[in-house]
Amino acid sequence: MADSKQAPLDSAAAAKAAFASVQDKPFPNDIFTASELRWAVIGCGVIANQMAQSLALAGRKLAGVANRTLSKAQAFAEQYGIEKVYETVEDLYADPDIDAVYITTPHNTHITYLRAALAAGKHVLCEKAITLNSAELDEARTIADEHNVVLMDATTVLHMPLYQELRRRMDAGDFGRMNLAQLNFGSYKEYGDLTNRFYNRSLAGGAMLDIGVYALSVMRLFMASQPAEVVSLGNTCETGVDVAGGIVCRNAEQQLGVVSLTLHSKQPKRSVISFDKCYIEVNEYPRADHATIVWTADGHREEVHTGTEAYALCYEMADLEKAVAGDDSKRELLGYASDVMELMTKLRADWGVVYPEEE
């Protein structure tokens, strides 16, 4: 973990540093444990490149790629040694040699690809935010069930081993009762160009779908049930998307969640989960592999290291392969994603944030 006194890296720089830290290390043999599927990716942006680089660490490759611009798909395939380049996504869906599809396109395009890929019998791992709203996600889940395929949300916190280990200990009663989850996420995005994806309503911009999904996912993972009460204040910009928000949630067990988000200021990506017996602090939580537990009785600090940041995207892909192989605990992750989407849909409605596809 980086020195806490240093300024945190932006996400791209952090990913690059993480990859460099494991470049010469053997890949763990406990990540990909289910039968290997043949994967194709839709989209050739930053996250698709990170996935290809992650797989290379494991000695694996994507089997195919499709992109709106064919030349970009061809260049991507050449860079990563991918065998198949599809002229259209329909060609990808029709290929019987592809088992699973990874969708990395802008948020507002996801449902179109989800409908077609799932109906074609492909398992799907879809980047966050998995859909624009709960109605779209419910539709995608129905299609997946009808065609007996796995749909999985690629929000990293749902798949990082650190959270699985902390939840295991929480469920075992090690920490006592969970009382309060506090999460911050501030990402400074220059406000001058309102056509960029962060502020562009036509690209489903805004803080909620881009960064809020991480904070709400961590919150929901540690709460015993979905919050029934949600109060908030949100700020929007002239394009109509949300740029900041303060959120307080409470569930039937009287557990509280407090979340702050902003695209106008840098904040630490910091989560503090407070229990009777301790509190757990996780910094840079979207791909975290380290947590500090501070015990109430004596102030002792326990350092927990589980998983590796550089393998974040491998954990996502491995979880889908495990779900396909019959691991119900991995299939259940979509339930948390659905709860988070329900919260985000309500919050955007409260703030008056409506995308063109929803009008």
PLM regions: where:
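N-terminal Rossmann-like dinucleotide-binding module
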Residues: 2-80
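Beta-strand-loop-alpha-helix segment that lines the small-molecule cofactor/substrate pocket
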Residues: 100, 106-107, 111-158
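Short, conserved SAM-binding/catalytic segment
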Residues: 75-82, 140-146
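Predominantly a Rossmann-like dinucleotide-binding segment in NAD(P)-dependent oxidoreductases
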Residues: 157-230, 238
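Short acidic low-complexity segments
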Residues: 83-96
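Short active-site oxyanion
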Residues: 38, 60-64, 99-101, 205-206, ...
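C-terminal helix-rich "cap/oligomerization" subdomain common to oxidoreductases
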Residues: 1-33, 100-102, 252, 319-359
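NAD(P)-dinucleotide binding in Rossmann-like oxidoreductases
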Residues: 235-242, 251-321, 328-335
